């Protein structure tokens, strides 16, 4: 591998890292603006009820799937009616950003 290829890979890796950091920052803002903190806590680790899950540090792929399932209606247990209403106003891109943020806590 020559120097040029090495530099290209480095630039791409840096871009991905910066993109994920920006996505996580956006996720923090979305977590607040979409009112997630009202039930899951400001730190996503102190829910307001004993049936509300802690979200901090959860696996990103798991979070994405659960949020998509709430949005589509595939998940219909517990607080699913409330979550379905909230998720109706959350885009696929926002789901990704919120999941990135929560998984990094």
Put a short name on every predicted segment.
Residues 48-56, 71-105:
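Axial heme c-ligation environment in periplasmic c-type cytochrome domains
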Residues 25-37, 56, 60-65:
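Sequence context surrounding c-type heme c attachment/ligation sites in exported
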Residues 35-42, 98:
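The canonical Cys-X-X-Cys-His
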Residues 15-32, 46-47, 51:
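Electrostatic cytochrome c docking/interface patches
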Residues 2-11:
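Bacterial N-terminal signal peptides that target proteins for export
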